[in-house]
């Protein structure tokens, strides 16, 4: 475990006793796009929120749609909006300090800082023309298919959308022909800077836990954390083109089969080593909130519009155990 940061090890602790930790991590603070489509139209990759909004307005004015956005996920509908909220919270208010306070309920869910974040999110969800299919399509579009319009072309040769904020695992849901273009046709840029300039990275991951402490279990854990296991994943021995990234900060990122995955792995590795990685906030909240009221109220917000922000945040605050 010497190459697994204390932050990740701590996620598997109860009362200071380690029962597990993170095996794989994914990068969430990214926006997928197609460089050729940007270059063809003279679009610059946005580095700030205001630049992204200006670009979105330009795309709408030119008769196209800037964002893919779909959050339907069966019984888990709503988590995609919570990811947006988390990235925004890291870059507004007091940055990582208010993010940590929010996750730990040291500030209420209806705090003005949280309302500001929800207002930014609503700007994306509810501005006319910003999302594929309009606002009504957000909650009915399966998150795994949400980016598909980016890979399609209309009669004028324009893609269905130009930007999609989603984690590094999403290529696993792409159509097969789109997967072949990972890193060439489709790549990513960092989630734009906002009110608080920050290099903090949002992520999540696959966790492991030991429930039976015997030699066989230990052998499995040792193997799944080993260089041998991750070399197989990174070099695509299975032929599945996995985008999984190890939580092992000593792993040689040049082994990843795709330059894009290697770049994401290096991005995560640097964030972990610099202690600027933050695990998905809703995953660290009480179940009643993180996978309960937060999901439900973000779904309602998408449906109801910006006038529902106060009600959504008040309802989540009331649900905190």
What are these regions (language model features)?
Residues 1-4, 71, 91-116, 177-181, ...:
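Short, solvent-exposed loop/beta-turn-alpha elements that line the ligand-binding surface or hinge
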Residues 1-29, 53, 59, 80, ...:
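Hinge/lid segment of periplasmic solute-binding proteins
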Residues 37-38, 54-62, 142-164, 300-304:
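Short helices/loops that flank or line small-molecule/ion binding pockets
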Residues 41, 169, 176-243:
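Extracytoplasmic/periplasmic substrate-recognition and gating elements
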Residues 259-321:
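C-terminal capping/gating helix-and-loop segments adjacent to ligand/active sites or protein-protein/ligand interfaces
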């Amino acid at each position: 475990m010497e190459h697994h940061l204390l932050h990740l090890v701590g996620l598997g602790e109860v009362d200071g006793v380690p029962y597990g930790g993170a095996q794989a991590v994914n990068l969430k603070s990214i926006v997928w796009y197609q460089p050729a489509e940007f270059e063809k139209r003279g679009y610059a990759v946005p580095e700030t929120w205001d630049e992204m909004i200006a670009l979105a307005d330009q795309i709408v004015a030119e008769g196209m749609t800037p964002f893919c956005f779909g959050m339907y996920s069966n019984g888990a509908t709503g988590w995609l909006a919570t990811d947006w909220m988390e990235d925004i919270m890291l870059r507004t208010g007091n940055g990582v300090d208010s993010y940590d306070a929010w996750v730990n309920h040291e500030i209420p869910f209806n705090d003005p800082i949280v309302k500001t974040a929800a207002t930014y999110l609503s700007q994306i969800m509810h501005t006319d023309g910003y999302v594929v299919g309009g606002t009504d399509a957000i909650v009915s579009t399966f998150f795994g298919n949400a980016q598909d319009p980016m890979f399609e072309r209309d009669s004028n040769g324009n893609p269905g959308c130009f930007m999609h904020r989603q984690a590094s695992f999403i290529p696993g849901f792409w159509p097969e022909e789109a997967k072949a273009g990972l890193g060439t046709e489709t790549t990513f840029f960092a989630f734009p800077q906002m009110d608080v300039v920050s290099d903090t990275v949002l992520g999540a991951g696959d966790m492991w836990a030991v429930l039976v402490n015997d030699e066989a279990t230990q052998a499995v854990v040792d193997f799944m954390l080993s260089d041998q296991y991750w070399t197989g994943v990174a070099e695509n021995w299975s032929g599945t083109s996995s985008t999984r990234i190890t939580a092992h900060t000593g792993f040689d990122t040049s082994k990843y089969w795709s330059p894009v995955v290697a770049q994401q792995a290096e991005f995560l590795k640097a964030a972990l080593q610099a202690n600027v990685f933050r695990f998905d906030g809703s995953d660290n909240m009480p179940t009643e909130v993180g996978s309960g009221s937060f999901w439900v109220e973000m779904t309602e917000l998408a449906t109801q519009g910006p006038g529902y922000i106060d009600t959504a945040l008040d309802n989540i605050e009331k649900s905190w155990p």
